[in-house]
A protein has these predicted regions:
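Regulatory N- and C-terminal appendages and interdomain linkers associated
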Residues: 1-48, 56-65
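Conserved ATP-binding subdomain of kinase catalytic cores across diverse folds
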Residues: 40-170
């Protein structure tokens, strides 16, 4: 669920704290305490639209590890991804639907994100664009990416660490 703007929400792996991880876990229904965390790189490189890290958790009743996901640090990647509201959509998927999907998905362990609107155009803009000639639509499509800018919204998602999925599914 979106949080009030004055709520602390980590925006990068460096901002992740044991207090936030504990609050996120308890907010998702876990009964636990979190005394300390250690953040390790996970994934990265080609095909990533955000920052993903493994979190080693010390505490009573807490999972030993989790995966934390944040928005991309690269402005253009973040701007494009935010224009489709992808970060908030991913969080909403885990909050609302992941348990109902008939394939194995990581368990939702908690999340926070700023309220706000995503960058999708309204119905009037869509009608105007649909009425344009094909060549103009192509030009808009090719050149719009240059003008997308990231917002200051913060997104933090905590999900189950499924380990080496390649070993399981590879």
């Amino acid at each position: 669920m979106p949080k009030p703007k004055d709520t602390f929400i980590p925006n990068t792996p460096d901002e992740l704290t044991a207090a936030w991880v504990g609050e996120a876990l308890r907010g998702a229904g876990e009964t636990c305490t979190v005394d300390d965390i250690r953040v390790e790189p996970l994934g990265g490189g080609v095909g990533m639209t955000g920052q993903t890290v493994r979190v080693r958790i010390e505490g009573d009743g807490a999972p030993a590890t989790a995966v934390a996901k944040f928005a991309a640090s690269q402005a253009q990647t973040r701007g494009i991804t935010e224009s489709y509201d992808s970060y908030a959509r991913e969080i909403r998927f885990y909050e609302r639907y992941a348990e109902r999907v008939p394939v194995r998905t990581p368990k939702y362990l908690g999340a926070d994100y700023d309220p706000g609107t995503h960058g999708q155009p309204g119905p009037v803009v869509v009608r105007i664009i649909e009425s344009l000639p094909v060549g103009v639509k192509r030009w808009i499509s090719r050149n719009t990416v240059k003008y997308l800018r990231p917002t200051k919204r913060r997104y933090a998602l905590l999900i189950e660490d499924m380990g080496d999925a390649g070993a399981v599914y590879g």
